[in-house]
């Protein structure tokens, strides 16, 4: 999971995104008015993860005006535009996520994360794949074994929704953030009849506050 710095101006966004791709993308030209997958992948530090690319793109445009976002989307090439339509994020409050969230879909949530203590009474289980010989099977393990887990609080209702990220990422700040990820299934217990819930596997986040103008911008 990474913290990214959103674009503040449309010209900055276009210059960054219409970059010609990596050195081996010989058919892709910079500043040609077309943004393709190789160019988006370069600025996002990604290669073939199309779903994650769209998350990066959407979150990076957070502070642009609606008409400016439309200009950028209009410059995506045919294939990337279809990818954008396929993976466009649900924009939800934490209080809406359990009811409206769609498993395996991208989502962007806003709230204040509170780290769940591993020794607390929180229980939740996820399926993880394992290889048995040449056969892949799935077992259930506590989510806290694989992830840092948080309750993301909805400021309007004080309701919370579970978000999580890999343990090799830095702990999220205890402040209002905008976070992007993918909805995944979470079970309340190991029993087959256990309640099925959801959590957001977080990939990117930004501060909810717009940066001060005229400061240099660096994307991670």
Regions found by a protein language model. Give the residues of each.
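OB-fold and OB-like single-stranded nucleic-acid-recognition modules
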Residues: 1-220
